[in-house]
Regions:
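Hydrophobic/aromatic beta-strand patches that form the interior of the parallel beta-sheet core
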Residues: 12, 102-104, 153-155
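Conserved substrate/cofactor phosphate-moiety recognition/catalytic segment
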Residues: 5-43
Length: 201
């Protein structure tokens, strides 16, 4: 949101709290994992499609999630039978959405994320384990180190405060700019960038 405000760019941000199965999932993952992941997948597809219909074709946008997030979390949360079924829905959704040009992966250790989760004090997240976060982190990195049609920038935020420290934020922006301009493309097409946070949802 700070980047969007700084550059007056439209942003698409996930409203995870609307998922009616999320709190139940944290209490009983085995019972609600398929429901929570399917809801997130369908909502992400719908939100991306609706948002892109409202903007100009060549307009730069930033999103704090991508559909790839659905695959990464479902692989961690679903059993093999449900995952195989889920992948069919994921691939259908993937075919409906244009890939981003750039993904900025804000990297942080599981311990750092666990501390942030505790400080924000959401009751339903209190039992999240560092092991779970480590598995999610490994899922993200295993996915993004592969060759893709889009560019991926890994940026470590463990020692940075992007919210309260302008120097840290400006360093991120400069890093993104320098990384992007290494490519000789003359312009950016939508969707421009997706900020991926290796969080717990």
């Amino acid at each position: 949101k700070m980047i969007c405000k700084k550059f007056q760019i439209n942003g698409l941000f996930e409203n995870y709290i609307t998922n009616p199965y999320l709190k139940s999932f944290y209490k009983n993952p085995r019972e609600y994992s398929y429901k929570v992941e399917t809801y997130f997948l369908n909502e992400r597809i719908r939100s991306l499609q609706d948002f892109l219909k409202k903007i100009n074709k060549d307009e730069v946008i930033i999103s704090d999630y991508s559909i790839f997030k659905s695959l990464i979390f479902s692989k961690q949360n679903l059993n093999s039978k449900n995952f195989n079924k889920y992948v069919l829905e994921y691939e259908r959704g993937l075919s409906l959405i244009k890939n981003p040009n750039l993904i900025i992966y804000l990297d942080a250790s599981p311990a750092f994320l666990l501390d942030r989760i505790k400080r924000r004090g959401r009751e339903f997240e209190k039992n999240i384990s560092e092991i779970y976060l480590k598995n999610i982190e490994q899922g993200y990195k295993s996915f993004f180190i592969k060759k893709h049609t889009f560019k991926v920038l890994f940026y470590d935020i463990s020692e940075k405060d992007l919210v309260n420290n302008d120097i840290h934020l400006n360093h991120l922006l400069e890093t993104v700019y320098n990384f992007w301009t290494l490519d000789k493309k003359s312009h950016i097409t939508i969707p421009d960038a997706t900020l991926i946070f290796n969080e717990c949802f």
